[in-house]
């Protein structure tokens, strides 16, 4: 998600509070289903706004009052979404956003957070994070599929349908919902990058650090567990380890956590040796 100015950051904070209130308004037994429904419906709202420029401009027009924009949101979406989702959309419409795109992007983000809450309630957050990471690696390694999913001449619905067919029955419902929404609204992102962003968001929801590891050979379960334990001690919080096999490393590992890179690979040592001999 792109950096927002102060007005939009405050608007997002207020709208997120409305989402929390909406989720808190339902009974405990219905909370998981409500979170999933709100997430899916927020995606549908954004899809409508993407298609209707006049409407999205009106909902973010700061020359009108927040109450006027809330009334417009209720008239347009009141019969299309649940009362809980409508409360979130009205709150968003009532805020003053720096630019219209911040309104839409924030609704997408809150939709994702709501779906991830549903996954967490079902004990599936780890699985969702891993599925989205692996999906990113699969797409990055399949140029034909990546081209199909990023082709701007293909309508968003066509790309969503293609990915949905590929994922059906193979991943959790939350992973499928998140991935298909993202691929239909890539903007300037590559599909693999969009899936990585979703995986990172899932990790953030459980306050985990993501370590992306490239290994010259597959790691055994014992090696993976030791690496995870070591990184957890190093960073002082839970660490999720995502491993890719890269034979070009010759031996060892390259670990990336955020902007920090630990290069313990054979290729890295050779490169350092060559540099020292110059």
From Swiss-Prot:
InterPro entries: ATP_synth_OSCP/delta_N_sf, ATPase_OSCP/d_CS, ATPase_OSCP/dsu. The keyword Cytoplasm does not apply. It is found in: Cell membrane. Its main location: membrane. One of its GO terms (molecular function) is proton-transporting ATP synthase activity, rotational mechanism. Pfam families: OSCP. It is a peripheral membrane protein. F-type ATPases have 2 components, F(1) - the catalytic core - and F(0) - the membrane proton channel. F(1) has five subunits: alpha(3), beta(3), gamma(1), delta(1), epsilon(1). F(0) has three main subunits: a(1), b(2) and c(10-14). The alpha and beta chains form an alternating ring which encloses part of the gamma chain. F(1) is attached to F(0) by a central stalk formed by the gamma and epsilon chains, while a peripheral stalk is formed by the delta and b chains. Belongs to the ATPase delta chain family. NCBIfam families: ATP_synt_delta (TIGR01145), PRK13430.1 (NF009967). This is ATP synthase subunit delta. The gene is atpH.
């Amino acid at each position: 998600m792109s950096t927002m100015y102060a007005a939009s950051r405050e608007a997002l904070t207020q709208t997120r509070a409305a989402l929390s209130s909406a989720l808190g308004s339902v009974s405990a037994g219905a909370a998981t289903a409500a979170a999933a429904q709100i997430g899916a419906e927020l995606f549908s709202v954004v899809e409508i706004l993407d298609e209707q420029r006049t409407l999205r401009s009106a909902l973010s027009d700061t020359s009108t009052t927040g109450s006027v924009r809330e009334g417009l949101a209720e008239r347009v979406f009141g019969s299309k979404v649940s009362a809980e989702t409508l409360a979130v959309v009205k709150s968003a419409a009532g805020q003053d956003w720096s630019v219209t795109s911040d309104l839409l992007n924030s609704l997408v983000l809150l939709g994702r957070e709501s779906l991830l809450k549903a996954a967490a309630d079902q004990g599936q957050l780890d699985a969702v994070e891993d599925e989205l990471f692996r999906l990113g690696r699969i797409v990055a390694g399949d140029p034909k599929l990546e081209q199909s999913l990023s082709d701007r001449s293909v309508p968003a619905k066509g790309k969503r349908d293609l990915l949905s067919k590929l994922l059906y029955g193979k991943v959790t419902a939350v992973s499928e919902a998140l991935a298909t929404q993202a691929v239909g609204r890539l903007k300037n992102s590559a599909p693999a990058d969009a899936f990585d962003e979703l995986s990172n968001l899932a990790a953030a929801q459980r306050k985990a650090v993501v370590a992306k590891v490239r290994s010259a050979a597959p790691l055994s379960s014992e090696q993976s567990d030791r690496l995870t334990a070591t990184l957890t001690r190093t960073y002082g919080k839970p660490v999720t380890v995502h491993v890719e096999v890269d034979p070009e490393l010759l031996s060892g590992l390259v670990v990336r956590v955020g902007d920090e890179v630990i290069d313990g690979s054979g290729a890295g040592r050779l490169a350092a040796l060559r540099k020292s001999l110059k």
